[in-house]
Amino acid sequence: MKILTINTHSLQEENYEQKLCWLVESILKERPDIIAMQEVNQTADAPLMAPELLAGQYPVPGALPVRQDNHAANVAIRLWQAGVACYWAWVPIKLGYGKYDEGVAILSLGRPIRSTDVFPISKVHDYQNWRTRAVLGVQVEGH
């Protein structure tokens, strides 16, 4: 199994759209089975993502709605557009920089996600506190 882990910084990055394209190109070239991302964010007050664009999403119970600029969703959309089945889950952990729902995501290329588990790894469990940390786990089909 090929696994890619990446700290994306997502929307905080300069030239975000260009870096998003580079990331997707790299994924298409390397074809990891699983992609684990941290610092995956969306603007907290951005419009909601249209449901028809959420192909492959495994909604994590209790998670916030996915917004139009959600980084994991936008990676998944581009992979689907390139003909790669991308199943994904995202969970927000904290409010970053006072404006981003920031969390972690796991993408699975070709294998649907069957279940998720989220558990805290910090003593702080306050969504407004930047020190809050948690882990997202997934079970994919066939494993």
Q: Where does each model-flagged region fall?
A:
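Active-site catalytic loop in hydrolytic enzyme cores
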Residues: 110-142
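N-terminal, active-site-proximal structural segment of metallo-dependent hydrolase catalytic domains
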Residues: 1-100
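Short beta-strand micro-motifs in enzyme catalytic cores
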Residues: 2, 101-105, 134-136
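Conserved beta strand-loop-helix elements of the APE1-like EEP
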Residues: 74-82, 98-116, 140-141
